[in-house]
Structures are given as structure tokens and as C-alpha cells.
């Protein structure tokens, strides 16, 4: 058995290590999976330089974030912490990664995407390039996507032009009209189910293929979070399909974001002093019921790391 703190809801969990699969719900409180917790841990490290639980994130409304069909398990909390909005490809608020609004280009500090890029219409390079264009010069894309270690990316459908899905009995077919006007019919489709419902798998990435897409789009640094982080229940038994952070440039806080963090830190300091100085806490400390040391040490660690 192992114990961990879910970095999405902040609750303590105790579970068997074998139950910590990439997709299986393993937090008894919010139902988060290893994939979700790994994604949010990567986001925390990329923005704050340390692994914080989502409830511990400072409220920095001057940082603008974009979600691509993010799960409500963390999307709702991100909206409380940042100037963040979640979008979808099939319902409002809609964002077409193949053709994003021009006014939004270069306006986001971070983009969060989990299991999206394997579903975008070909060519996939168009979606990666537009994600790059949506970010500010110092922005970061944090994503997960299924990928294999060796080989090349496998595109399931080449030459898609005018296409759609058709239900024939109990089968779903993809029907495409090519550039030459020929009709193609594809069977044996693979669908994944996520926040937006069923989504057609367009490709199977390889690690090298995914890295190449990101670097060709312009990202200067691509980091795969291959290390486990048991404290958050992020245990990677496989070496594939791990969280990835792709930086457009060196991330830095704006003056507004820095002010937001400092103001919150000052309020935290004040509240901690008032709490530690209360009569009941001081009495409990003297009687051995309350230990202030961990609180004070954690407070100092956060100050030094920032």
C-alpha cells in the first residue's frame, strides 16, 4: 500500500500501487488518474518552479491560461486561480485549433491539453503551430498524448479533405472525398472518450514524431516528465505517454503576476502569525497537542524556493 496527496483536490489517499494506472481513477475523492495528476504537476513546475497541489496554487489572475477540452476535475479550479478558460471543439466555448481567432494569438501564458493532439484533423503540424502562435513569447504548452517509444508516427487517414462520420447499422464509418473527387470509406475506427465525449483517433504518435512536431512548430525546449512523484500519486511504471512541457521561451512572471504572488504571500504570513499567536494554539502547543514546526518550516521553504 502507498499513501499520497492528490494534487488536484488535495485529499489524502491510501491505495495499492498496482491500482495506480495511467487512466484508472485512483483518488477516492475526485477520481483523478495518474495522467491528470502528472499533467498538473508538470504545470505547477513550469509556472512556479516547484510541485504544488492545485489548492496550493497562488491566485494569479494576471496569468492567462487556455484549456483544450480539459477535465472539469481541474478546469474549474484553474479558473479560480488564473485568468483561464476551458474550450471545446464541439460545443461552446469553441476553439478550433486548426483555425484559432486572430485576436487571441500571442495572448496566453500557458495552454493545457490532455489527449487532444491525436484527434485533431490532419495535418497535425497545423495544430501544433497554432498552439505555438496562441502563446505569449514566454508561454508554455503542457500536454499529454499517447505515444510509443520507437518507430514513426502512424497517420490513420491520409488525404482527408471533405470528410464526415456515417452510421451504418451498428458500425461507424469515415467517408472522405479526396482532392480528386474520389470517395473513400474507412472502417475499424478507434474512438477515445473524454471531456468532450467520443473523439476519433487520427494518429498514433511516436515519441520522436511528437518531439519533431513540437520543435518544427517553434518550441525551443521540450521536456518529458519521466520521473515519478509518489507524494502526489504520480507513479510512472511505463516510459511512454508521459506529460510533456514545451516552452516557447523562458517562462517569467510579469510585474502584475509577481505582485499578485507577493500580496498573497504577505496575507499568508499575516494569517499564519495570527493563527500561531492565538491563545488556543499556543496552549495546544505547550501541551503537545499542536506542533507548529512543520507549518513554519513549510512556510520558510515556500519563501526560499520562490
Give short role names for the model-derived ranges.
Residues 1-106, 110, 231-243, 253-273, ...:
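Conserved N-terminal segment of class I S-adenosyl-L-methionine
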Residues 4, 122-267:
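S-adenosyl-L-methionine-dependent methyltransferase catalytic module, highlighting the catalytic core
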Residues 97-100, 116, 199:
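Generic anion/oxyanion-binding catalytic loop in active/binding sites
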Residues 110-116:
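A short beta-strand submotif of the Rossmann-like class I SAM-dependent methyltransferase core
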Amino acid at each position: 500500500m502507498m499513501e499520497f496527496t492528490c494534487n488536484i483536490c488535495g485529499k489524502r489517499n491510501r491505495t495499492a500501487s498496482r491500482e495506480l494506472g495511467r487512466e484508472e481513477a485512483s483518488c477516492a475523492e475526485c477520481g483523478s488518474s495518474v495522467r491528470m495528476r502528472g499533467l498538473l504537476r508538470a504545470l505547477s513546475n513550469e509556472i512556479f518552479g516547484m510541485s504544488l497541489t492545485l489548492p496550493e496554487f497562488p491566485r494569479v489572475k494576471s496569468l492567462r491560461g487556455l484549456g483544450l477540452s480539459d477535465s472539469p476535475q481541474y478546469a474549474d479550479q484553474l479558473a479560480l486561480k488564473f485568468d483561464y478558460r476551458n474550450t471545446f471543439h464541439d460545443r461552446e466555448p469553441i476553439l478550433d485549433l486548426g483555425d484559432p481567432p486572430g485576436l487571441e494569438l500571442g495572448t496566453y501564458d500557458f495552454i493545457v491539453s490532455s489527449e487532444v493532439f491525436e484527434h485533431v484533423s490532419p495535418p497535425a503540424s497545423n495544430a501544433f503551430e497554432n498552439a505555438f502562435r496562441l502563446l505569449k513569447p514566454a508561454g508554455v504548452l503542457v500536454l499529454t498524448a499517447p505515444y510509443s517509444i520507437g518507430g514513426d508516427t502512424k497517420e490513420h487517414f491520409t488525404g482527408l479533405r471533405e470528410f464526415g462520420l456515417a452510421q451504418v447499422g451498428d458500425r461507424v464509418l469515415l467517408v472522405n472525398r479526396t482532392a480528386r473527387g474520389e470517395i473513400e470509406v474507412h472502417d475499424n475506427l478507434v474512438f477515445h472518450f473524454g471531456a468532450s465525449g467520443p473523439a476519433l483517433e487520427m494518429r498514433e504518435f511516436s515519441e520522436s514524431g511528437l518531439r519533431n512536431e513540437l520543435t518544427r512548430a517553434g518550441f525551443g525546449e521540450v521536456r518529458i516528465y519521466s520521473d515519478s512523484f509518489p507524494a502526489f500519486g504520480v507513479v510512472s511504471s511505463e516510459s511512454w505517454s508521459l506529460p510533456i512541457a514545451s516552452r516557447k521561451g523562458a517562462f517569467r512572471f510579469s510585474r502584475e503576476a509577481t505582485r499578485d504572488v507577493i500580496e498573497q504571500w504577505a496575507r499568508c504570513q499575516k494569517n499564519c502569525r495570527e493563527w500561531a499567536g492565538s491563545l488556543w494554539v499556543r496552549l495546544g502547543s505547550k501541551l503537545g497537542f499542536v506542533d507548529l514546526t512543520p507549518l513554519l518550516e513549510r512556510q520558510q521553504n515556500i519563501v526560499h524556493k520562490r
